[in-house]
């Protein structure tokens, strides 16, 4: 579309999306977003301040409008240029080869598990140790009762002190 044939008033009535559609149609190749914005500003005669004020809405409109497609790397084109199968291929990012890490030596030898024959004597010693550990735990639990008895005595002492305090308060109130 030749914009020279339009008067400045007619150009001001054109939306930015209409201008981009005709610019991309004339170019017939994908263009970066920044280049599109510069061309719109040139065609419509917009100042940099006006462009900055409208750029967010323009980008939103460009994304929403079904006639345009983002081809990655901030390049835009017309959807009609690309068959559906080709669109998927262009949008997908190219896989980057992964860098191989150097294997660091941890200073340990790799241990290969083998079936080892265990003696029955080793197993019974471990069981004896487990029984002794269990006996220690049970003894410790018996000692916990002593701690509870101490807490009960502390509660009793506190209750007696509280009772004495209450009686002292009552006597002071009676004196007044």
From Swiss-Prot:
Keywords: DNA-directed RNA polymerase, Nucleotidyltransferase, Transcription, Transferase
GO cellular component: DNA-directed RNA polymerase complex
Chain intervals with Acidic residues compositional bias: 106-176
Domain HTH HARE-type, first and last residues per copy: 14-81
Superkingdom, taxonomy of origin: Bacteria
Region span, Disordered: 90-176
Gene3D superfamilies: RNA polymerase, subunit delta, N-terminal domain
PROSITE patterns assigned: HTH_HARE (PS51913)
BP term (GO), one: DNA-templated transcription
Pfam families recorded: HARE-HTH
GO molecular function: DNA-directed RNA polymerase activity
UniProt similarity note: Belongs to the RpoE family.
Record function comment: Participates in both the initiation and recycling phases of transcription. In the presence of the delta subunit, RNAP displays an increased specificity of transcription, a decreased affinity for nucleic acids, and an increased efficiency of RNA synthesis because of enhanced recycling.
Subunit structure: RNAP is composed of a core of 2 alpha, a beta and a beta' subunits. The core is associated with a delta subunit and one of several sigma factors.
Protein name: Probable DNA-directed RNA polymerase subunit delta
Gene transcribed to yield this protein: rpoE
